[in-house]
UniProtKB/Swiss-Prot annotation:
Organism: Thermoplasma volcanium (strain ATCC 51530 / DSM 4299 / JCM 9571 / NBRC 15438 / GSS1)
UniProt xrefs under InterPro entries: ATP-synt_VA_C (IPR055190), ATP-synth_a_Xtn (IPR031686), ATP_synth_asu-like_sf (IPR023366), ATPase_a/bsu_AS (IPR020003), ATPase_F1/V1/A1_a/bsu_N (IPR004100), ATPase_F1/V1/A1_a/bsu_N_sf (IPR036121), ATPase_F1/V1/A1_a/bsu_nucl-bd (IPR000194), ATPase_F1/V1_b/a_C (IPR024034)
GO cellular component, one term: plasma membrane
PROSITE patterns documented for this protein: ATPASE_ALPHA_BETA, INTEIN_C_TER, INTEIN_N_TER
Lipid bilayer topology: Peripheral membrane protein
Catalytic activity as recorded in UniProt: ATP + H2O + 4 H(+)(in) = ADP + phosphate + 5 H(+)(out)
UniProt function note: Component of the A-type ATP synthase that produces ATP from ADP in the presence of a proton gradient across the membrane. The A chain is the catalytic subunit.
Keyword Secreted: no
Modifications the protein undergoes after translation, according to the UniProt entry: This protein undergoes a protein self splicing that involves a post-translational excision of the VDE intervening region (intein) followed by peptide ligation.
Keywords, alphabetical: ATP synthesis, ATP-binding, Autocatalytic cleavage, Cell membrane, Hydrogen ion transport, Ion transport, Membrane, Nucleotide-binding, Protein splicing, Translocase, Transport
Family stated for the protein in its record: Belongs to the ATPase alpha/beta chains family.
Domain of life where this protein originates: Archaea
Official protein name in the record: A-type ATP synthase subunit A
SMART domains, per the entry: HintC, HintN
Amino acid sequence: MGKIVRISGPVVVAEDIENAKMYDVVKVGEMGLIGEIIRIEGNRSTIQVYEDTAGIRPDEKVENTMRPLSVELGPGLLKSIYDGIQRPLDVIKETSGDFIARGLNPPPLDRKKEWDFVPAVKKNDIVYPGQVIGTVQETSLITHRIIVPDGVSGKIKSIYEGKRTVEDVVCTISTEHGDVDVNLMTTWPVRKARRVVRKLPPEIPLVTGQRVIDALFPVAKGGTAAVPGPFGSGKCVSGETPVYLADGKTIKIKDLYSSERKKEDNIVEAGSGEEIIHLKDPIQIYSYVDGTIVRSRSRLLYKGKSSYLVRIETIGGRSVSVTPVHKLFVLTEKGIEEVMASNLKVGDMIAAVAESESEARDCGMSEECVMEAEVYTSLEATFDRVKSIAYEKGDFDVYDLSVPEYGRNFIGGEGLLVLHNTVIQHQLAKWSDANIVVYIGCGERGNEMTEILTTFPELKDPVSGQPLMDRTVLIANTSNMPVAAREASIYTGITIAEYYRDMGYDVALMADSTSRWAEALREISGRLEEMPGEEGYPAYLGRRISEFYERSGRARLVSPEDRFGSITVIGAVSPPGGDISEPVSQNTLRVTRVFWALDASLANRRHFPSINWLNSYSLYTEDLRHWYDENVAKDWGSLRSQAMDILQRESELQEVAQLVGYDAMPEKEKSILDVARIIREDFLQQSAFDEIDSYCSLRKQYLMLKAIMELNSYQSMAIDHGVTMDNLSSLPVREKLSRMKIVPEDQVESYYSSIIKEIHKEYTSFIGEKNAEANI
């Protein structure tokens, strides 16, 4: 039995630990806190503790469990929510309430639940490592395959059928070295990668249904991708702001917050100057979504601090005080745009709810512009003109409602304005063709993790209609949890992903965010008094990041039959200030082969997914070209290249247009700008809230891109024959092309054919049939 000699935050030094080995799990102090040995010098062992060490004293005991940090693998992983060291959060809530009591270590898998085991082999059969000996229907979507452990082969001595718990023996195998019992559950050390026969080249794409990803920047199954995710931007309102509830009543947001805070069923999470209330019963409100006002709900209330507020008053008597970065919907001649409060001007038209049926038409804009913006709804949306804008300085309490599924806004303010709110969308988890999703919330703020924990269980798998959680494992490790557990959460998640890969499944693992993991490494390194590297990160940062990403890949698995599986790792990095030149981003980009550059300016223009096509890249494009040619179309690669060339050319021509003016540009260059706009708005832009547009099959993507390139070809031909863009820009087929994204999958082939015919008909009316045929 060892004893503590030194404590430094999450790092504890103990001496005389019995049989101490690197990465052994130990129980620290009288409370039995879980820790891991990370350094041994003589009789002294350095331990990183995965729980808060407050109150631990020198000379308290340290007990060695004689085993490395491991995870339990078996039926019951799916639909579970764990912390960084695989403690089930739902079980902990029942045991200790809303906060995790120290020293608690409940089993990750339910020991009492019985699973219906169906054997796939029979007595006296010869089995080999990796062979499937039976199955369990884990969820409605996933069949859990029980396989022979690695290194075990022999004859089946006995096998059972029917109801079994995870600890029950389902099979006994006679080997050269004695009998080996196989349970439904096994354990595996998290730092050790599970063995495969060989890694395979990345030749099959992970289809996401997002056009900008699948068409321009694809990721392969078994590939690696990096996504920069900047910190939140604090879009809040003052406490005096009324919120319009679905029952027709209004209540000040500070009073709403106070009343919900008093309810015992709600969970209050407090941080430095911030509080978040996790609501058991969601608040029913209204939101503005795609031009209509709909009933919505919020499960999160936020309270924070701000030194400045912007007071906005309108001609119609409406008013609201918001933080400078808060966005409002502004009606312009081009449509509806989101504008930060600090950028609003007197005279701007901001979205509101009409107080009378006639007010929607009496908002000072032309009827054509209002109709184009689609502001008529059952609640009569309108726009009100800003009369005055004033800045207020002081120490203000500010509040927010989180409304992730309903346009990220709510109706509130004096006179009912549309108030913005933001949250990350998880389209990849919902739509990618991976069988299993493992989501690791590594050091993210509590309110962001709560969004995920409350949103995921309510999402439906779009293919099967079953709950998305039926194929998902969530690992929640918030920023106020001990930093050491952040590192463990990354390894816990990748080990669970490897387990399902070994069954032959395609797994998508999302780590959000690896920057927080790196910050944990930096803090532990500092406590260990190691020589710091760049920006204080340890010198081995690059090696740790590469070791994690190297566990991805598509592989031929250990099995007597041909079985293949893959792990696709998508890691979010959160560089301070969005600076991707810092060490974590650079080391991540060095080992990942896809980079999706999120662009705040695109998000501000309501262009989603807001992936910048000029700064993003995919090194899998050439590897996947053969698959696309064989499974989609022979000219897929050339269409992609044409689209990328046009977008690249547009960025160059925009600088020229700003210097000389659009009207002074040659018609050819006007045409390039025009086609690039069509690609951006009608192809790359995609609505996550539209039932049809939220997912786009590869075939539909191909036909959309083919139609745009066909239009580009005819347009270029027409300009060669002296036709101007003024004549071409008003052709009816262009509007039909813009609607192609909302055409159902079963109608897209006929719709494409009609578009091609109309393009030929309308453009040849300018240049003549013979000229068109000659040029084609």
